[in-house]
Amino acid sequence: MLSRVVLSAAATAASSLKNAAFLGPGVLQATRTFHTGQPHLAPVPPLPEYGGKVRYGLIPEEFFQFLYPKTGVTGPYVLGTGLILYALSKEIYVISAETFTALSLIGVMVYGIKKYGPAVADFADKLNEQKLAQLEEAKQTSIQQIQNAIDMEKSQQALVQKRHYLFDVQRNNIAMALEVTYRERLYRVYKEVKNRLDYHIYVQNMMRQKEQEHMVNWVEKHVVQSISTQQEKETIAKCIADLKLLAKKAQAQPVM
């Protein structure tokens, strides 16, 4: 895994140096501007969670798989041993005191990795799981908030779609209020006209009654004035005679 990182970093550095022009000591001119390209709409493949397999902590497994069809199972080891012996025989690499120091350091590092590596890996995995759990919780919270916002928006859209019912209700209420006002005013006019007609009828009845009383009084007055004293005496005498006759008839009838 470490070799892949080193090789990729070296390839990136080489390509950047190849495409750059020297302006001065320690100064490079960039030939392209970063973060200005058009975004790709294709789906980005997910990054691997774990790295590829390596042998001896440095050599990728793909190197052995590449040489197996051509050299067999022992081919990569023979090739590596031959390269080491070639470098030593041609004095490309000379063994010195630093070589033993490097071997000692490498041995200590390998021992530390073998002994404490799993515990450190478990601790790192726990930290990673905690971070993933926090991110997942934040993601679920965000999804829930967005879902709530979507539900609220849908409810608001439903209310907006049904607002014409509110307009119809308000229109009907206004029509009913106008109808009630119209009927109240019509009843007020009816009462006013009825009161005026009743007043005129009362006035007419009063005038007719007064006219009748005046006529009766006038006739009675003239009748009384037309009766003489002799006629009055005769009438009184006739009334007394009639009363006496009625009294005799009443006495002649047996009492039941």
Curated annotation (Swiss-Prot):
MF terms (GO), sorted A to Z: proton-transporting ATP synthase activity, rotational mechanism
Record flagged with keyword Phosphoprotein: no
Alphabetical list of Pfam families matching this protein: Mt_ATP-synt_B
Transit peptide as UniProt keyword: yes
GO cellular component term, pick one: proton-transporting ATP synthase complex
Keywords assigned by UniProt, alphabetized: Acetylation, CF(0), Hydrogen ion transport, Ion transport, Membrane, Mitochondrion, Mitochondrion inner membrane, Transit peptide, Transport
Family: Belongs to the eukaryotic ATPase B chain family.
Protein name: ATP synthase peripheral stalk subunit b, mitochondrial
Gene expressing this chain: ATP5PB
